[in-house]
Every structure is written in C-alpha cells, then in structure tokens.
C-alpha cells in the first residue's frame, strides 16, 4: 500500500479508508481562494456496499490499495456463485454474488466462455470489469405495429441472458444487438 495526496485521487481509484477497501465513484476538486484546495469524494465500501461522501483537504493523504487485474474465463452460475477459470493456471474458482459490489447488476451481462477482468485485492475478488458494450442475441421481441413511428418508438426485447432492454421497432427475434453495459440501454444492431 502506498499513500497518495487527496488531490491525486481519480475516479475509479481503490483506497483503504477507515480500515475498509473503497472505490472512488465521484471526485470533485475545488480550489479555494487563500484557503488551499479541497477534494470531495463519493466512496463505495467494497465490503458492505455503503456509499459515503467525504471532504478532504488537498494536502491530506490516504492509503491507496494495490489491486491486481486478472483475466478470467466465465464458466457458469451456480446458485449464489459465479464460477471462473484462471487463464494462467486453469484453476477454477467461485465468486460469491454477495461478496462483490454491484455484481448482481453485472450477472445478466456475463456470457459463458467469455473472458472478463476481475479486480483482486490480495486473494479476494472485489470488482468485475465489463466491456463498454456487450453483444447479445434477441430471443423475444414485441411485435411492431405499423404506424408506431411518429416518434422514436422503442419496444421491449428479451436477450439470451434474460436481460430486457428497450430497442427500436426494427429489431426482431434472432437479431444480435450491442447493449451499453453501464446504462443497460440499446446501443446498435450488430452488422452480420
């Protein structure tokens, strides 16, 4: 672990704050007149998922935790765990859904046999990185009604992982679409 000045903290940094690992969700830097600078942080506790707001002076220091990014292949979901394979050792390991922040939200984006980046702190997985856009096959789509195109009309489509998103009327069953993994919104149709 190393200490860094609060002015050097970036969004997405991993910090040890009050003895617990946190990720920086938001960061705002303010330069005061003669009083120096302050940094406002929004932190998410990686253990209990609580979100706190902290204000630090620009000269304050905090502990930055050393994390390791490991590429692992997603194999399958087993009750409350996700099973991955380490690509270097070929060992299989499980990650409990309740142990990782926002993992429940990311499960519907995981596809078997795909490789994902897991963020580890020591031997513990603390985060999972998704690509910005993920390709899915549409398995169910509402029927588009002719004449619904006065505005930017959208309909619900169900993807092969169970995720339901709004998509344009021209999307049909069997189409492949890209979905933004951060906003869970339709991005574009995959060209064949």
UniProtKB/Swiss-Prot annotation:
Gene3D superfamilies: 2.30.30.30, Nucleic acid-binding proteins (2.40.50.140). Keywords: Cytoplasm, Elongation factor, Protein biosynthesis. InterPro entries: Elong-fact-P_C, NA-bd_OB-fold, Rib_uL2_dom2, Transl_elong_fac_P/YeiP, Transl_elong_KOW-like, Transl_elong_P/YeiP_cen, Transl_elongation_fac_P, Translation_prot_SH3-like_sf. CDD domains: S1_EF-P_repeat_1, S1_EF-P_repeat_2. Its main location: cytoplasm. Pathway: Protein biosynthesis; polypeptide chain elongation. It is found in: Cytoplasm. One of its GO terms (molecular function) is translation elongation factor activity. The keyword Cytoplasm applies. GO terms for cellular component: cytoplasm. One of its GO terms (biological process) is peptide biosynthetic process. Involved in peptide bond synthesis. Stimulates efficient translation and peptide-bond synthesis on native or reconstituted 70S ribosomes in vitro. Probably functions indirectly by altering the affinity of the ribosome for aminoacyl-tRNA, thus increasing their reactivity as acceptors for peptidyl transferase. Belongs to the elongation factor P family. HAMAP family: EF_P. This is Elongation factor P. It comes from Borrelia duttonii (strain Ly). The gene is efp.
